[in-house]
């Protein structure tokens, strides 16, 4: 007469779609009793139930992406890589660029950006994030002559929506999620991002920087703005 027992074992499984997570499996052990009263193992094949994990270019889930975006906001204008300072005022998830009406630019503390004060602490060539249209993280650009550029650059990557940091050492924007690259004006120069970063007008109204939707021709490409 035979009896069966179930014992848990831990297995690493694989699937056609990529790697799978460690999972708990059941190993069926039929026990055959011989004439001496001893059991003789005859193992059957293991059936493993694992949750499949997509391979390679896996996109972080939304919670992790939002956390990454928040961590990047405070340090993207720093030349030293890896120094991440969270800015608590940028909790609004990024949109797709654009908007309607003028929106005062907000700094990392949530204060209105005063153009003259901003230029005292941000040198020529600087690109620092502020909160812009629709709550999107938007770069204010200081031109090489020390003046504030008349445009802001939306930091939302046109591939999958990550916040793109500015790499001062390479003088371009490089997305940490999938490696898309944009020049220092936000024009796409390397995929997988299909489009350039969105623009917004950076006007000065009563001393304050105000973002206004950009609906004219994109000066970087000579084409109509995709975000308008």
Curated annotation (Swiss-Prot):
Listed Pfam families: Rieske, TM_PetC
Class of enzymatic activity (EC top level): translocase
Membrane association type: Single-pass membrane protein
Transmembrane segments: 71-91
Catalytic activity: 2 oxidized [plastocyanin] + a plastoquinol + 2 H(+)(in) = 2 reduced [plastocyanin] + a plastoquinone + 4 H(+)(out)
Residues engaged in binding [2Fe-2S] cluster: 157, 159, 175, 178
Transit peptide: 1-49
Entry superkingdom: Eukaryota
Cofactor: [2Fe-2S] cluster
Family: Belongs to the Rieske iron-sulfur protein family.
NCBIfam families for this protein: Cytb6fFeSPetC (NF045928), PRK13474.1 (NF010001)
Protein name: Cytochrome b6-f complex iron-sulfur subunit 2, chloroplastic
Organism: Nicotiana tabacum (Common tobacco)
């Amino acid at each position: 007469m035979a009896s069966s027992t179930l014992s848990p074992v831990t297995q690493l499984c694989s699937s056609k779609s990529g790697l799978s997570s460690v999972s708990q499996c059941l190993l069926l052990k039929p026990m055959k009793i011989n004439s001496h009263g001893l059991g003789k193992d005859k193992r059957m094949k293991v059936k493993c139930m694992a949750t499949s994990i997509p391979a390679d270019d896996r996109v972080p889930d939304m919670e992790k992406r939002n956390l990454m975006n928040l961590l990047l906001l405070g340090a993207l204008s720093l030349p030293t890589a890896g120094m991440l300072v969270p800015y608590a005022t940028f909790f609004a998830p990024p949109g797709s660029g654009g908007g309607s009406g003028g929106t005062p630019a907000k700094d990392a503390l949530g204060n209105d950006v005063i153009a003259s004060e901003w230029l005292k602490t941000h040198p020529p060539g600087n690109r620092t994030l502020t909160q812009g249209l629709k709550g999107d993280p938007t770069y204010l650009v200081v031109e090489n002559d020390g003046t504030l550029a008349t445009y802001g650059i939306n930091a939302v990557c046109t591939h999958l929506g990550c916040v793109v940091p500015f790499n001062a050492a390479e003088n371009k924007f490089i997305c940490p999620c999938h490696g898309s690259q944009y020049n220092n004006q936000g024009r796409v120069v390397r995929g997988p991002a299909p489009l350039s970063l969105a623009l917004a007008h950076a006007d000065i109204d009563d001393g304050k920087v105000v973002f206004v939707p950009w609906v004219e021709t994109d000066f970087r490409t000579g084409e109509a703005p995709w975000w308008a």
